[in-house]
A protein has these predicted regions:
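Acidic, two-metal ion nucleic-acid-processing modules in DNA metabolism proteins
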Residues: 111, 245-291, 295-345, 380, ...
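Short, ordered loop/turn segments at secondary-structure junctions
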Residues: 89-90, 117-120, 147-148, 170-173, ...
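A short helix->loop->beta-strand "cap" motif at the edges of active sites that frequently abuts
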Residues: 139, 161-164, 658-662
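Histidine/acidic-residue-rich, glycine-tolerant segments that coordinate divalent metal ions
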Residues: 145-198
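A short acidic, amphipathic alpha-helical/loop segment
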Residues: 153-157, 359, 374, 489, ...
Length: 757
C-alpha cells in the first residue's frame, strides 16, 4: 500500500534533563522534552519561555542605530505638515505594515498616502516610476515598509529629486546599501538581539510606537498597533522567538476582542469559532485570517486589505472583508486547478526523481500569484525542490513577440534556493529569495539551460536520502497519555509557529480500527485508532485521502487538537507523519559471555601460528587458514584477529564458536563509513527490506557487512527517522562512530579487562 513519501527525524530523548525541566515548570515529561528540543534546556530559559514578560524589555533605540534619526526626520515632517508617502508591498507583511503606519500618521494629523507596486506588472518593492510620481505630487518624505533595502536605484532617484527616505525592511542586506537618510533593518543589528527576527511589520511597529511616544499618543495607539503587528508577524511566518514571541502572546489576547473593525469583520467572515474570541490562537491567523489577506495580495488589489485594516466604519469593514473572502475562494480554486494540472504534467514526464533531484514545472496560463502555494504542495508530495513557473507573452516596441517565464521556488532543508539561483544566474533575468523559497524570471529560450544547470546544482548538494519530506518529531507518546490535560499544557507553549512549532508526538505500532475519506473531493483521511485500553481516539489527516486504505498497523506522528461537538470537547490527532511499523531487532539471541581462557598475544608473524587456525578481520590476507566464518564444531588452536570485529558481541560469538587456545590480535583498523555514507547504505537497505515486507533485521549480520556495531546502525536508523523502539538508547551517530573508531584501537590489556567483566 502506498504511503506518503517521508523521512522522520526523532529528537534524541534526554531523560535526566527532562526530569529537571519537568520539576521546575510543572509540565509533563513529554512537554519538558519539547522545551529541550526548542533550546530551553535550563530552568531559567524554560521559565522565561513560558512567561516571556518576566524578562526586562530592551529599549529598541539602543539596538537600531538609525532609529533616533528616523524619529527626528518624522517629527520634523509632522510638525511642518510635510506630505509623507508609504511605499508598501503586496504580501501580508507589507500590507499590515502599511496599515500600521497609516493609522499612526493619520492620528498625528499628517497628510499621508501610500503606494503598492503592481504584482502583475512591476513586481516587488519601490521603483523609479513610483518615486517620480510621488515627487510630482509634492511628497517630501518616503517611508518604505517590508522593502527598500535592495532598491538602490529607486532610493538614489528619490534622493536626487530632493526627497528624504526612511527604509524599514527586514530582508537580507545587499552588497551596497541604498543612500537613504535612515535605514531600520534587524539584519543591521546584533544577531543575538531579541529584535533580530522581527518581520517588516515588526520594524514598522517599533518606529510607529516610538513616534507615538514622542507626541504623547502611545496610549491611543499601542493596542491597535499590537493587533496589526501580531496579524502581520504570524501571517508572514516570522520566527516566534525573542520579542516576537513576547508581543504576539500579548497580541493574540487582543485580537479575539479586536478594537479594529476590519479585523472583527475578517474574523466573522472567516468563521472562527466564538470560543477563540477570548484569545486567538496562531493557527486562526495562519490558516484563516492570513490566507484571506494574502489571497488579495496574490490575485486581487492590495488596496482592499489596507482599506479594511484602516477602516473605522463597521459597515465598510464588513463589505471589504466579504471581498477578501470571495477572493480567497477564487484563490483556493486556482490553487486546486493548477495543482491538478501540475501533477498530471509531472506524471506524463515519467521522471526518475532520484536522477533529477529537482522538479522544474513550467506551463502557460497559470496565475503566478498562486504558483508558490502549489510549489509547496508539490514539495510535500514529491520530496524534492520545486521550481514552478508560467510563461508570459509580451510585445516589444518593434512589434516582435517576447516570451518569458516567471516562477516561484520552494525547497527542502538541504537545498538552498538562493544559492541555487545564484548558480544559475547566467540564465536568469531577475531573481531573489532565501534558503527555503524564492522567485525568478528569465527568457523562455533559457529554460533548457536553466534546467540542466539546476540538476547539476542538485546533484552536488542532495543525496538520495534527502529526497523525502522531512518530519521532525519531538517525543514518543502512548495513546493512553493523550488527554485534555496534556492539550491544556500545550497551550502554555503557545504561541506556536515558525521557530516554535506545535509539538509533534509519535506512537509506534498503532492499530487502525476504521478509516474513511471525507471532505471536498474526498481529500481528507479520517481514522479511528485503538488506544490500547479498550477505548478509541480519532485522527484526521488533511490531503491524505488518496492513501486510503492504509495498513492496519502503522507508526504515526501527530499534533493534538481539540474537537468540539455538541458542547463536548475531546482530543483528536492531526496526523503529519505515517510509516509502516518497522522495528529492527536481533534475529538471534546474543552470545553468552565468554568463559574462554585463551592466551592473548599481539600478532607479529603468520609463520609461527599454531594450526588449525581461523583468520578473521577487515581486509585480511589469504594465507591458507580457514577464514571469516568458523566451520561448525571444529576446534581451533589459534584465532587470528587481523582486526577486531565490529563489537564486543561479535567478539563473544567468535571466541565461543572457535574456542581457541591462543588469540592473536593484529593492528588493522577498518575504514569506517562517514555518517552520510552509512545513512545512504541504510536508506537503500530499508527500501529493499520494505519491498520484501521484512520486519526484522539481523543487526549482527548487517553490522559485520558494514564493520560497525549494532548501536551505530541503530543511531543511524534513528537519525533517518526510525524509532528502533526495542533497542536501548544511543548517542548521536557522530559520537557512536567516534566510539567505533576507539574500539578498533583498543589495547589487549583493556580488551581482556572488558571480557573478564
Amino acid at each position: 500500500m502506498a504511503l506518503p513519501l517521508q523521512r522522520w527525524h526523532i529528537a534524541p530523548p534526554q531523560p535526566d534533563l527532562v526530569a529537571e525541566i519537568s520539576a521546575s515548570t510543572g509540565l509533563s515529561p513529554m512537554l519538558a522534552q519539547v522545551l529541550i528540543n526548542r533550546g530551553m534546556d535550563t530552568k531559567e530559559r524554560s521559565q522565561i519561555f513560558l512567561d516571556p514578560d518576566r524578562e526586562p524589555l530592551i529599549d529598541p533605540k539602543s539596538e537600531f542605530p538609525d532609529l533616533i534619526s528616523s524619529l527626528d526626520i518624522l517629527e520634523l515632517a509632522v510638525k511642518n505638515q510635510l506630505k509623507i508617502a508609504i511605499c508598501g508591498d503586496y504580501d501580508a507583511d507589507g500590507m499590515t505594515s502599511t496599515a500600521l503606519l497609516l493609522r499612526t500618521l493619520r492620528l498625528l494629523g499628517v497628510e499621508v498616502s501610500y503606494e503598492i507596486p503592481s504584482r502583475m506588472h512591476e513586481g516587488y518593492g519601490i521603483n523609479i516610476r513610483m518615486v517620480e510620481e510621488l515627487e510630482a505630487r509634492g511628497v517630501s518624505l518616503i517611508i518604505t515598509v517590508d522593502n527598500g533595502i535592495s532598491a538602490y536605484a529607486a532610493i538614489a532617484c528619490a534622493r536626487e529629486l530632493g526627497l528624504s527616505v526612511i527604509i524599514t525592511d527586514h530582508h537580507d542586506l545587499p552588497e551596497q546599501l541604498p543612500p537613504a537618510n535612515a535605514i531600520l533593518n534587524p539584519k543591521l543589528i546584533n544577531p543575538d538581539s531579541p529584535y533580530y527576527a522581527i518581520a517588516g511589520v515588526g520594524v514598522a511597529y517599533i518606529l510607529a510606537l516610538e513616534l507615538a511616544d514622542r507626541f504623547g499618543k502611545r496610549p491611543n495607539l499601542e493596542s491597535l498597533l499590537l493587533e496589526l503587528f501580531t496579524l502581520g508577524t504570524i501571517a508572514d511566518l516570522a520566527q516566534l522567538t525573542g520579542i516576537n514571541r513576547r508581543l504576539v502572546k500579548q497580541g493574540l489576547r487582543l485580537l479575539g476582542r479586536s478594537q479594529l473593525p476590519g479585523v472583527t469583520a475578517l474574523i466573522q467572515a472567516s468563521g472562527i469559532a466564538d470560543d477563540q474570541k477570548i484569545g486567538l490562537k496562531p493557527e486562526a491567523i495562519g490558516f484563516s485570517l492570513g490566507p484571506r489577506i494574502n489571497a488579495v495580495g496574490r490575485i486581487g488589489d492590495p488596496v482592499t486589505v489596507i482599506e479594511l485594516l484602516t477602516a473605522d466604519d463597521m459597515g465598510k469593514a464588513i463589505t471589504l472583508a466579504q471581498e477578501c473572502e470571495a477572493t480567497n475562494r477564487t484563490r483556493q480554486d486556482l490553487c486546486s486547478q493548477i495543482e491538478r494540472e501540475a501533477i498530471a504534467y509531472i506524471q506524463s514526464l515519467n521522471l526518475n526523481l532520484n536522477n533529477e533531484r529537482v522538479l522544474v514545472v513550467i506551463q502557460p496560463n497559470w496565475h503566478h500569484g498562486v504558483i508558490g502555494i502549489v510549489a509547496s504542495r508539490l514539495v510535500e508530495r514529491y520530496g524534492v525542490p520545486v521550481f514552478i513557473g508560467t510563461t508570459e507573452e509580451s510585445e516589444e516596441d518593434n512589434g516582435e513577440q517576447n516570451s518569458s517565464i516567471r516562477g516561484s521556488v520552494r525547497s527542502i532543508p538541504e537545498f538552498n534556493v538562493f544559492e541555487a539561483l545564484q548558480f544559475c544566474r547566467e540564465y536568469l533575468g531577475k531573481y531573489g529569495g532565501h534558503p527555503a523559497a524564492g522567485g525568478f524570471s528569465m527568457p523562455s529560450s533559457n529554460l533548457q539551460g536553466f534546467s540542466d544547470r539546476l540538476r547539476e546544482f542538485a546533484h552536488k548538494h542532495l543525496e538520495l536520502h534527502h529526497l523525502k519530506p522531512l518530519i521532525s518529531v519531538d517525543v514518543k507518546a502512548d495513546l493512553q497519555d493523550i488527554s485534555l490535560t496534556l492539550l491544556e499544557q500545550i497551550d502554555l507553549l503557545h504561541p506556536c509557529g515558525m521557530g516554535n512549532s506545535d509539538p509533534v508526538f509519535y506512537t509506534d505500532n498503532v492499530r487502525v480500527i476504521s478509516q474513511q475519506v471525507r471532505g471536498k473531493n474526498k481529500a481528507c483521511l479520517a481514522l479511528e485508532l485503538d488506544r490500547g485500553n479498550g477505548s478509541k481516539i480519532k485522527a484526521i489527516a488533511w490531503r491524505w485521502g488518496e492513501y486510503c486504505p492504509i495498513p492496519d498497523r502503522v507508526d504515526l506522528a501527530y499534533k493534538l487538537r481539540a474537537n468540539k461537538w455538541q458542547d463536548k470537547t475531546s482530543v483528536e490527532l492531526e496526523l503529519v507523519g505515517i510509516r509502516t511499523t518497522w522495528t529492527p531487532i536481533f534475529e538471534s539471541k546474543p552470545a553468552p559471555e565468554t568463559k574462554n581462557s585463551a592466551i592473548w598475544q599481539n600478532l607479529k608473524s603468520l609463520e609461527t601460528i599454531l594450526q588449525p587456525a581461523l583468520i578473521y578481520g577487515y581486509d585480511h590476507p589469504e594465507v591458507g587458514f580457514d577464514s571469516d566464518r568458523p566451520i561448525p564444531h571444529k576446534l581451533y588452536k589459534s584465532l587470528i584477529l587481523w582486526s577486531l570485529p565490529p563489537s564486543i558481541t561479535h567478539l563473544h560469538w567468535l571466541i565461543n564458536l572457535t574456542k581457541p587456545e591462543i588469540i592473536y590480535l593484529g593492528d588493522q583498523i577498518p575504514i569506517l563509513p562517514t555518517t552520510l555514507e552509512l545513512k545512504q547504505k541504510l536508506t537503500k537497505y530499508i527500501e529493499q527490506t520494505s519491498i520484501n515486507l521484512a520486519d526484522k533485521v539481523n543487526l549482527l549480520d548487517l553490522g559485520q557487512k558494514l564493520w560497525v556495531a549494532p548501536c551505530v546502525i541503530v543511531a543511524a536508523l534513528r537519525e533517518l527517522g526510525n524509532s528502533c523502539a526495542d533497542f536501548p538508547p544511543t548517542k548521536s551517530l557522530n559520537t557512536e562512530l567516534k566510539n567505533q573508531k576507539h574500539w578498533y584501537q583498543i589495547s589487549i590489556e583493556r580488551l581482556m579487562s572488558i571480557l573478564q567483566h
